[in-house]
C-alpha cells in the first residue's frame, strides 16, 4: 500500500458526492450519568413489606386518652377569678383538670400493656401554665415543661412529654396526632353562641394573660373518651402513680 492510501487516525472522513467534510474523532463515554442523591431517593424503586389485614386499624377518631392528673387538694389560686367570670355566663369550670399526654386509637381487642415505664419518664416534671385562650369551643390555658431541675438531676428536662409519645409509638400504640399545643382545658363554651365565645376568650386573654400557675402531676391515667364519669370526673381504666423524687427540691422551684 502506498503513502496515498494512508488514513489519518485523528479524523474520520465522510465523502459525499460534492464535498469532503472532516469531523474530529471523539471517544464515546460508557460511564453512566450521575444523578443527584435526592433524585436517587426520589425515583429509586422501593420494596415494601406486604400489608396484612391485621396491620390495618379502622379508627376515625381517638378512643382513649393517656393523661396526667394532679393532687385534688392542690389549690389553683389564680383560677378563682376565672371561675367568677364563667359564673356570669352560666358556664361551669372544669372539675377534671388534666393534661393530655397522647390520644390513642384502640380498636376492638386492643389491650393496654403496663405503662409504668412512662411514669419514670414523666417523674419530677413541673408544668407551667400560662396564657389563656379559646381552642375551638373550649377555654384552655397553655402548658409547658418548666426547666427547674439541674441537668445532672433530670436529663430530659423539657422533653418528657415528647419522649412519652415516642415510647408509645415504639411499643405499637396507634397515637392520634392532633397538632394542638400542650394545654389544660378550663371550661366548655358550647352553651354560648359564637359572639359570646369570642368575647369571653378575648376578655380572659386581656385580663388574665399573665396568669401563671405551677403544678407537678402525681398520676398517669388511661381513660375511655366516651367512658363513664363520676361527679364530673372521668373514671380511669388504669392509673399509675408518679413518684416525684425531687418534689421537695426548692433551689429552683417557683411554685409549690
UniProtKB/Swiss-Prot annotation:
Question: What does the entry list under GO cellular component?
Answer: host cell cytoplasm; host cell nucleolus; host cell nucleus
Query: Which keywords annotate this record?
Result: Host cytoplasm, Host nucleus, Host-virus interaction, Inhibition of host IKBKE by virus, Inhibition of host innate immune response by virus, Inhibition of host RLR pathway by virus, Viral immunoevasion
In the record, biological process GO terms are: symbiont-mediated suppression of host cytoplasmic pattern recognition receptor signaling pathway via inhibition of IKBKE activity; symbiont-mediated suppression of host type I interferon-mediated signaling pathway
Regions that span the bilayer: none
CDD domains reported for this sequence: ORF4b_HKU5-CoV
Spell out the disulfide connections. Answer: none
Protein role: Plays a role in the inhibition of host innate immunity by inhibiting the interaction between host IKBKE and MAVS. In turn, this inhibition prevents the production of host interferon beta. Additionally, may also interfere with host antiviral response within the nucleus.
Q: What is this protein called?
A: Non-structural protein ORF4b
The organism's taxonomy opens as: Viruses, Riboviria, Orthornavirae, Pisuviricota, Pisoniviricetes
Amino acid at each position: 500500500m502506498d503513502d496515498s492510501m494512508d488514513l489519518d487516525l485523528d479524523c474520520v472522513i465522510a465523502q459525499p458526492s460534492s464535498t469532503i467534510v472532516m469531523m474530529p474523532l471523539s471517544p464515546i463515554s460508557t460511564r453512566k450519568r450521575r444523578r443527584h442523591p435526592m433524585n436517587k431517593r426520589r425515583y429509586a424503586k422501593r420494596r415494601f413489606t406486604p400489608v396484612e389485614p391485621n396491620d390495618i386499624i379502622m379508627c376515625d377518631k381517638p378512643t382513649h386518652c393517656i393523661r396526667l392528673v394532679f393532687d385534688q387538694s392542690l389549690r389553683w389560686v389564680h383560677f378563682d377569678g376565672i371561675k367568677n367570670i364563667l359564673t356570669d355566663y352560666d358556664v361551669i369550670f372544669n372539675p377534671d383538670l388534666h393534661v393530655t399526654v397522647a390520644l390513642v386509637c384502640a380498636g376492638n381487642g386492643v389491650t393496654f400493656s403496663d405503662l409504668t415505664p412512662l411514669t419514670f419518664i414523666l417523674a419530677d416534671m413541673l408544668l407551667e401554665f400560662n396564657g389563656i385562650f379559646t381552642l375551638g369551643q373550649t377555654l384552655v390555658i397553655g402548658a409547658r415543661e418548666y426547666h427547674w431541675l439541674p441537668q445532672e438531676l433530670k436529663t430530659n428536662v423539657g422533653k418528657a412529654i415528647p419522649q412519652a409519645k415516642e415510647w408509645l409509638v415504639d411499643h405499637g400504640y396507634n397515637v392520634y396526632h392532633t397538632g394542638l399545643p400542650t394545654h389544660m382545658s378550663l371550661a366548655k363554651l358550647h352553651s354560648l353562641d359564637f359572639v359570646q365565645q369570642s368575647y369571653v376568650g378575648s376578655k380572659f386573654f386581656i385580663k388574665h394573660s399573665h396568669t401563671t400557675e405551677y403544678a407537678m402531676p402525681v398520676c398517669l391515667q388511661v381513660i375511655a373518651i366516651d367512658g363513664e364519669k363520676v361527679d364530673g370526673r372521668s373514671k380511669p381504666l388504669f392509673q399509675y402513680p408518679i413518684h416525684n423524687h425531687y418534689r421537695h427540691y426548692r433551689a429552683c422551684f417557683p411554685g409549690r
